[in-house]
Amino acid sequence: MCSGLIYLRNRYYDPSIWRFITEDPARDGLNWYVYANNNPLKYIDPSGLRSKKAADKIIKDNATYIISAAEEFGVNPGILAATIYAEQRLNVDWKDDYIDGIVGFYGVDTSIGIGQLRISTAKFIEKEGYMPTLSAKDGGWNIPLIGFVHGTEQMVREKTLENSELNIKYAAGYLKYFQDEWKNVYPDIDGKTDILATLYNLGHEQTSPNSNPKPNDFGKFAKENYSHVRKLLGLE
């Protein structure tokens, strides 16, 4: 370019100062103006979003919850982890960590938490019987001089999804829903990482059981990282 700047997918790089001119959207590491923690030989940053290192840590830190939820709902822990991993790598940027809970609190049907579940999806999972049904009475705040005040059902569900352990249970319940819905026409569904992750990504409103499902890029990414996340879980 005539400006001397180089466009690298998501940001412009200034070779004269060896720095990007804007912050890394993932805000990963101590310096947000460098590439891949300033270590391009060890790390890559294909999207400018959540780094592999950060996503790996999320799976490791929540391994106990993932394995426990998978056992409770009868889903493969590797598939559950791979689906969460795909959400973290492909669909999360730094803004999600800060604004999803806020906009969800005010009624926007946004994706929240480690499994990036929409509030409406969580309500559907409850309706189908995979998680307890929440109501406005299940949450609230103690306000000085006023006492305990309940919020709305939306607020309760949003706050619930911010809890990683509960969010993972919703994610496991959603995968179990798809297994149950598809098993008669596609008996191998419970072992298909790419298909289950695709269904999770597209959602129940855009999919219907059939005997010849095809994965999307999200599902393919989850399948490619299946063995990797099992290692992160300590299962290999």
What residues fall within each predicted segment?
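Catalytic glycan-binding domains that act on GlcNAc-containing polysaccharides
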Residues: 51-236
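Short turn/helix-capping motifs enriched in Asx and small/polar residues
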Residues: 1-52
